[in-house]
Amino acid sequence: HSVYVDQWDWEKVIRREDRTLDTLKRTAQEIVDCICDVSVRLNREYSSIHTRLCREMSAITAQELEDMYPDIPGGSQRENKYLEQHKTALIMQIGGKLRSGKPHDGRAPDYDDWALNGDILFWCDWLGCAMEVSSMGIRVDPAALDRQLTLSHHDERRDLPYHKALLNGELPLTIGGGIGQSRISMLLLGKAHIGEVQASIWDDETVSACEKAGVTLL
């Protein structure tokens, strides 16, 4: 991110029977399909754009990823290893501690259900690493919020208006997420730095490094 963060946030009301990993994966695939559709159209209309994205999304849990790469210590490093082969993936169930005793990545306890959330990532050949474009998930219901507040040692939030209403079952069940606008632009245009698609403020070190790499900052 730069100092300016731009993203689309969305939220959709669902039924209790929709609080499943299948719903999560199906929704994530719809987002991937939309991004890939735009990429195909851009490549067709602009001869200078040659980005190729993989529409086939692989879904894997954070625990499965740790089991697959036990010698790789960090979540982002395991993501890169996996995405290098699978190109497009949904990394699911982020927030709780894995069997190693460490979480894959941090997540707020009062947002997504840690058992029903995920990150959408694409592999970027021009960067040699994975890029996360969306963090999403089925939101906490009363049981999940109760559990996650205790696990994260944030029981003091229970008396806040939002938390109290949710714990009392007064709010609808939803799925939602955020989609990084500038990250999508970088992905579709094959750009190496967020400053190529977004006008912002950069320190001298970043400006110098980009000049040496031939990266034009807006």
Annotated model-derived regions:
Residues 7, 21, 28, 159-160, ...:
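Alpha-helix initiation and N-capping motif
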Residues 62-218:
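A translation/RNA-centric and nucleic-acid-associated enzymatic feature enriched
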Residues 23-42:
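Compact, glycine/acidic-enriched structural inserts
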Residues 27-33, 48-57, 215-218:
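Noncatalytic linker/hinge segments flanking ATPase motor cores
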Residues 14-22:
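Inter-helical turn/loop segments and adjacent helix faces that build the functional surface
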